[in-house]
């Protein structure tokens, strides 16, 4: 079992950061280690998406159903993949029009203990930098608008 819990205060609205996190189809453009992203179902209340991970010679794919509560949270539940279980939650707490606190919690365990020992380190690295990658994407897109 592994748990990732990260948070950050960012100089952007909760709505803006929520939209970037929910922009899964573009993850390969800005999430380190994400090799593919496919949206399988996209509704107002939820999204089902498949993500490919490829880093340091390790590659795997997983699918989650994401429950959407704009602009406050995105809750992730495993549909399929190499995990025994995987759940996660993004929370966006608006502090002002131009600031919010972002929190990401991911709880998971890989099916295969031996493969999991290697893969878990890579998944931890990616999960631990997700907020940084989202913030960098926000900075890049915000500067293009200014």
Model-based region annotation:
Residues 1-44:
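Hydrophobic ligand-binding cavity/cleft-lining segments
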Residues 2, 43-45, 58-60, 84, ...:
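Residue-level preference for beta-strand/loop junctions
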Residues 6-8, 62-67, 87-94:
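Hydrophobic/aromatic beta-strand elements that line small-molecule binding cavities or substrate pockets
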Residues 17-21, 27, 49, 66, ...:
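Hydrophobic pocket/interface hotspot
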Residues 136-146:
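Short, highly charged C-terminal tails/helix-capping segments
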């Amino acid at each position: 079992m592994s748990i990732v819990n990260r948070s950050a205060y960012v100089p952007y609205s909760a709505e803006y950061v929520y939209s970037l996190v929910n922009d899964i189809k573009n993850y390969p453009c800005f999430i380190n280690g994400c090799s593919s992203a496919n949206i399988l179902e996209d509704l107002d209340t939820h999204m089902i998406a498949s993500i490919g991970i490829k880093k340091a010679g390790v590659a795997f794919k997983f699918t989650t159903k994401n429950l959407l509560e704009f602009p406050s949270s995105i809750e992730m539940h495993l549909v399929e993949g190499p995990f025994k279980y995987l759940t996660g939650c993004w929370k966006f707490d608006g502090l002002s029009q131009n600031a919010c606190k972002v929190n990401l919690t991911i709880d998971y365990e890989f099916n295969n203990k031996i493969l999991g020992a290697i893969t878990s380190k890579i998944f931890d690295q990616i999960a631990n930098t997700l907020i940084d990658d989202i913030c960098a994407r926000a900075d890049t897109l915000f500067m293009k608008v200014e």
